[in-house]
Amino acid sequence: LVLPSIDGYVGADALSVYTWVKAMEGRKKILAVDIGTNGEIALWHRGQLSCCSTAAGPAFEGAGLSMGMAGKTGAVEHVRVQDGVLQAHVIGGGAPKGICGSGVIDALACLLELEQLDETGLLEQDPAPVAPPVCLTQKDVRMVQLAKSAICAGLRTLLRVEGLCGADAAELAVAGGFGSYLDVNSAGLIG
């Protein structure tokens, strides 16, 4: 089964998210986000589906980062702090080759926790080691900040058009592979 695109910037993957949102229509308000190069956002409210697309850039997919890669063998997919030290989980085990989107979000949250990254996104050490040889640079942090800002702008705009604020949304669903591996606590910590 191949789903059609909704429009030039809202593709078939987003259509599957919107189909899920439609299936949940008994619920009051649901926001769904499909994060990729385009951040596609859907809002189900008052029996109507509204959507928008933002230019999130590829940072959440690991692309465009100094050591970014897709979520495949060798990618750091999760990072935790244990006894004051970063501990990374690498897909497939073995030595890390790069870092994927979920790993970047975790790594930034951990660097914040360890006070090696401040609230403005400034790294104490550039590059910051995550799982040697994998590290994050100041430019990587800025790319993630730009992607986050694009998603946030899309969410706020869509809510404002519908006369809502963030607190009005009953649920937020993050779709796709990225959504499946994203640690909600890490995402919340980095904003």
Where are each of the predicted segments found?
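Glycine-rich phosphate-binding loop of actin/hexokinase-like ATP-binding domains
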Residues: 1-5, 16-19, 25-98, 102, ...
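Catalytic cores of large soluble enzymes that bind and process phosphate-bearing ligands
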Residues: 6-10, 96-100, 135-150
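Generic secondary-structure signature for well-ordered alpha-helical cores
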Residues: 23-26, 47, 81-84, 109-117, ...
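A glycine-rich phosphate-binding loop feature that marks nucleotide/adenosyl-phosphate handling sites
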Residues: 35-37, 124-130, 168-178
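Feature representing long, continuous alpha-helical segments
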Residues: 102, 106, 110, 142-145, ...
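Short glycine/threonine-rich loop-to-helix capping motif typified by GTGT followed
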Residues: 164-167, 176-191
